[in-house]
Regions:
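Short coil/turn residues that cap or connect secondary-structure elements
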Residues: 29, 33, 59-63, 85-89
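C-terminal amphipathic alpha-helix
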Residues: 5, 76-112
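Alpha-helical segments in soluble extracytoplasmic regions
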Residues: 2-56
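Short, charged, amphipathic alpha-helical segments
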Residues: 38-43, 64-72, 91-101
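Short, solvent-exposed, charged loop/turn and helix-capping segments
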Residues: 51-68
Length: 112
């Protein structure tokens, strides 16, 4: 990870805490809470996007490709999960969330 001073810790912490919050979202998945889940996912994705942008921009050129790959996989997964939540198909939501969960755990490990 690039060290961009005091703000690095703040950006990495917010990425980590947003990922943790999204991991806790598993209990709410389902048709009843789909509107809430969709809004919460968009909110947390916005925070993560902003902080990843700051971290990637400040990273050394050699450290950027792994961060870009991780961010791209995460946001692709978010898009699939959001589409599944919108359709309210429980099987699809579970499948997409399982994929997203693995990437979120990787994000938490990388930002530690």
């Amino acid at each position: 990870m690039a060290d961009i001073g005091p703000s690095f810790a703040a950006h990495a912490y917010r990425v980590r805490s947003s990922a943790f919050d999204l991991l806790a979202l598993e209990d709410l998945l389902g048709k009843e809470a789909s509107n809430y889940v969709n809004k919460y996912l968009r909110l947390k994705a916005t925070f993560i996007y902003y902080d990843f942008d700051k971290l990637i921009t400040a990273a050394d050129p050699d450290a950027r490709p792994p961060l870009l790959d991780l961010a791209n996989r995460l946001f692709d997964s978010f898009e699939k999960l959001q589409a599944a939540v919108t359709t309210k198909d429980d099987a699809d939501i579970g499948s997409c969330y399982a994929d997203t969960k693995l990437i979120l755990q990787e994000v938490m490990t990388r930002m530690a």
